[in-house]
């Protein structure tokens, strides 16, 4: 049993990336291994994947490699199921994060989506309703910050909004754990005008990959 508060969590946006590398394969294993010629990744590097599988836009950490230099391990990623990860699923790209900008003065964080949806039906002969799960709603997060256009994150978030591409968002928890998300950024940088309150500005992100990645 445990109890944890998010107080002290720091969110950061990845603002620069190394050149994209081609991934030619990902193994079916309890710890997946990716093949990429001269990738140059080291243990601890944060990488976002791009392919046509369940790992598309998934953020991963590179594990210690006891393998040839053209291979790198995907820490905590289990691809042993050939049903979920059929042959050829891993062909795609990988991009390493090279810097993050911390988002300060956050006063509120809200999450939405992820609700399980169902298909329901009734057979004429017995009149009983049945249901089975279908999909989960797309997920999003909203961060409210005290407005300050002189802080680095302000212009970085505007640039990410204008780019319209996928970014890595990091949540560094007070326990030392880290959660990574791949997101589309929505931010116009405009302040609120509520009397007798700090001016606020709102960051909205939609998750490109519905599954976050957590590392202790």
Q: What does each model-found stretch correspond to?
A:
Residues 145-178, 186:
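Acidic, glycine-rich flexible loop segments
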Residues 13-15, 49-53, 171-176:
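Short acidic, glycine-rich loop/turn motifs
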Residues 36-52, 162-168:
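Short coil-to-beta transition motif at edge beta-strands of beta-rich domains
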Residues 130-149, 197-212:
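Oligomerization/assembly interface segments of phage tail-like spikes and tubes
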Residues 126-130, 188-189:
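Short structured motifs
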Residues 2-5, 16-28, 36-39, 52-126:
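Small/polar beta-strand repeat architecture
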Residues 170-215:
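Short beta-strand and beta-hairpin "edge-sheet" elements
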Residues 46, 57-61, 71, 178-184, ...:
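Well-ordered beta-strand positions in beta-sheet-rich domains
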């Amino acid at each position: 049993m445990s109890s944890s508060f998010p107080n002290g969590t720091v969110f950061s946006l990845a603002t620069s990336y190394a050149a994209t590398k081609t991934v030619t394969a990902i193994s079916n294993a309890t710890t997946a291994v990716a093949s990429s010629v001269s990738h140059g990744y080291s243990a601890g590097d944060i990488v976002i994947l791009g392919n046509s599988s369940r790992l598309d836009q998934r953020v991963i950490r590179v594990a210690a490699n006891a393998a040839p230099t053209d291979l790198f391990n995907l820490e905590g990623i289990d691809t042993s199921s050939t049903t979920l990860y059929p042959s050829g699923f891993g062909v795609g790209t990988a991009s390493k994060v090279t810097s993050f900008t911390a988002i300060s003065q956050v006063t509120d964080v809200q999450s939405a989506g992820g609700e399980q949806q169902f298909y329901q039906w009734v057979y004429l002969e017995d009149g009983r309703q049945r249901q089975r799960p279908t999909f989960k709603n797309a997920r999003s997060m909203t961060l409210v910050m005290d407005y300050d256009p002189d802080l680095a994150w302000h212009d970085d978030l505007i640039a990410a909004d204008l780019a319209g591409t996928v970014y890595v968002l990091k949540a560094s928890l007070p326990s030392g754990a880290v959660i990574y998300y791949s997101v589309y950024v929505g931010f116009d940088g405009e302040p609120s005008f509520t009397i007798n309150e700090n001016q606020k500005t709102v960051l909205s992100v939609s998750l490109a990959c519905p599954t976050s990645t957590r590392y202790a």
